Every structure is written in C-alpha cells, then in structure tokens.
Amino acid sequence: MAKKSMIERDKKRARMVAKYAAKRAALKEAFNNAADPLEKLEIHRKIQNLPRNSSPTRMRNRCQITGRPRSYYRDFGLCRNVLRDWAHQGLLPGVVKSSW
C-alpha cells in the first residue's frame, strides 16, 4: 500500500493537469504556429510560467485499490498483484487463466 500522501499528491496533480489543459494546449498550438523566433521565445516563457504540476508528464499511474505505482495495467487500472487476485476470484469479466 502506497503512502496516503503520495496518492493525494498524484490526485492533486491530476486536478492541476485538468485545470490547465486547455491553456497549455492553446500555448503549444501558438508555439507551433509561430514563425518569428522572438514570438516563439515569448510563448515558451508563458508555458514555463505555468505551474510545474500542471504538466501531464508529472502524473503517475497508480493502482486504484492499493495505490501501487509500478506494474500498472492501463486496461484495468490495477497493479499486477490486485489483477492476479481478482482474476483468480473471477471478478474480471473475460479474463481467463491461460493454458496451452
């Protein structure tokens, strides 16, 4: 189980990313369309002045149950440990144990 503070920190980052997503996308679009190097520099400064945690790169995928940050399966939103337990219990529709 991950520390509650780390889980809450990631939730805060997710809220921050959602809040600034439109502004960041507009600035990036303007940056890509700008022809003048000075204009590009000014837009780049505006992007840099956005909060650091508003960047999607700083978000970390975590297991919804345990908060574990590693071995995360996007399709399920779970870590491998919970995925294995739930699959054995039959709680994941369509997931079957492999045999060949």
From Swiss-Prot:
Keyword Ribonucleoprotein assigned: yes
GO molecular function: rRNA binding; structural constituent of ribosome
A GO biological-process term: translation
A GO CC annotation given for this chain: cytoplasm
UniProt keywords, alphabetically: Ribonucleoprotein, Ribosomal protein, RNA-binding, rRNA-binding
Stored PROSITE patterns: RIBOSOMAL_S14
Source organism, top-level taxon: Bacteria
Any single Pfam family the record assigns to this protein: Ribosomal_S14
InterPro entries: Ribosomal_uS14 (IPR001209), Ribosomal_uS14_bac/plastid (IPR023036), Ribosomal_uS14_CS (IPR018271)
Subunit structure: Part of the 30S ribosomal subunit. Contacts proteins S3 and S10.
Stated role: Binds 16S rRNA, required for the assembly of 30S particles and may also be responsible for determining the conformation of the 16S rRNA at the A site.
Family note: Belongs to the universal ribosomal protein uS14 family.
Protein name stated in the entry: Small ribosomal subunit protein uS14
Annotated source species: Picosynechococcus sp. (strain ATCC 27264 / PCC 7002 / PR-6)
Gene for this chain: rpsN
